[in-house]
């Protein structure tokens, strides 16, 4: 939010920029709660897209989109699974390899059969 203000002493006008705080707690699998971390979200996407032809700008856009979607929920808590589902949805349309990398950690593939099954569902 951009605001024009005036100094009470000298009457000089100046501009301030304010950002709305976004307090969101993430409910983990074990029911622990921790504050939402944009950096943690971004790092998980960076890891999945490593050595892929994906610009940091695209990664930032995905993070921005997901964060905005979470803000639009107007809720103070969200399950980590719902955040992971959003990441997977974005990666699936962006880059299949990045999607599989993320899915292998997120869905906790136990063996090659789990990976093969996920690949089959992508076709």
Predicted regions and their residues:
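Amphipathic alpha-helical segments that form the core helices of the histone-fold
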Residues: 60-73, 84-89
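Basic nucleic-acid-binding interfaces
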Residues: 12, 27, 38-59, 63-64
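Long C-terminal interaction/binding lobes of large macromolecular proteins
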Residues: 81-82, 86-92, 98-100, 104-123
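Short metal-binding segments enriched for Cys and/or His
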Residues: 8-25
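N-terminal, polar/charged subdomain of small-to-medium soluble alpha/beta proteins
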Residues: 21, 27, 63, 113-116
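Conserved phosphate/pyrophosphate-binding and hydrolysis machinery centered on Walker-type P-loop NTPases
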Residues: 34-35, 56-59, 73-81, 105-109
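Short metal-coordination and nucleic-acid-contact micro-motifs, chiefly zinc-binding Cys/His arrays
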Residues: 1-6
């Amino acid at each position: 939010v951009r605001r024009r203000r005036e100094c009470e002493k000298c009457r000089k006008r100046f501009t301030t920029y304010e950002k709305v705080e976004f307090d969101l707690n993430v409910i983990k699998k074990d029911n622990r709660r921790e504050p939402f971390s944009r950096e943690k979200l971004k790092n998980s996407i960076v890891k999945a897209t490593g050595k892929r032809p994906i610009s940091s700008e695209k990664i930032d856009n995905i993070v921005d989109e997901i964060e905005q979607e979470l803000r639009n929920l107007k809720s103070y808590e969200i399950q980590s699974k719902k955040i992971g589902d959003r990441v997977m949805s974005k990666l699936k349309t962006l880059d299949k390899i990045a999607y599989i990398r993320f899915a292998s950690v997120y869905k906790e593939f136990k063996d090659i059969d789990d990976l093969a099954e996920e690949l089959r569902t992508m076709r």
